[in-house]
């Protein structure tokens, strides 16, 4: 499970770094401490990873409603001191219920995340067999 979370962190960092390369550093943006959140809303489980000022991860059952699960994730993050509506937090969502994450800065398909994660882990171009 630890390897899974490491992969999610790599994918999240890679996506955000590419999207904001000219405007932000992954460590700080304009002198602020930043938090980066990767959310994978699957059909049965939702996985969340936080990296930056806070370093956390957790898993919740998705249940019948991805929208309700997103609210639970948002509330749990707030309990941990991570405000997803803050300019100091950037969020990437993927998975079956990714569209329900209305507070995400970026929404990416699972296939794209797998490809970017595989490339990051392999250190360059590679083949992925699913």
Residue spans of the language-model regions?
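Acidic/polar hotspots within intrinsically disordered regions
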Residues: 5-7
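Alpha-helix C-terminal capping segments
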Residues: 52, 119-123
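Short glycine-aspartate micro-motif
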Residues: 36-40, 90-92, 126-130
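Short, Lys/Arg-enriched N-terminal segments with co-localized hydrophobic residues
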Residues: 11-33
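Short coil/turn connectors at secondary-structure junctions
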Residues: 34, 44-46, 87-88, 122-126
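Short beta-strand-loop/turn "lid" adjacent to the catalytic site in phosphate-handling enzymes
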Residues: 59-62, 81-112, 120-121
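A short, N-terminal amphipathic alpha-helix
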Residues: 72-83
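Short glycine-rich, Thr/Ser-proximal phosphate-binding strand/loop in the N-terminal lobe
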Residues: 36-72
């Amino acid at each position: 499970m630890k390897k899974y979370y490491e992969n999610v962190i790599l994918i999240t960092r890679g996506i955000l770094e590419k999207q904001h390369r000219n405007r932000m550093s992954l460590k700080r943006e304009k002198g602020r401490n930043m938090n980066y959140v990767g959310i994978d809303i699957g059909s049965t489980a939702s996985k969340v990873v936080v990296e930056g000022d806070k370093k956390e991860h957790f898993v919740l059952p998705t249940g019948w409603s991805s929208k309700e699960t997103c609210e639970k994730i948002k509330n749990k993050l707030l309990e941990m001191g991570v405000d997803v509506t803050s300019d100091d937090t950037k969020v990437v969502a993927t998975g079956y219920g990714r569209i329900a994450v209305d507070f995400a800065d970026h929404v990416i398909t699972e296939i794209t995340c797998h490809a970017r994660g595989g490339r990051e882990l392999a250190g360059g171009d590679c083949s992925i067999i699913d």
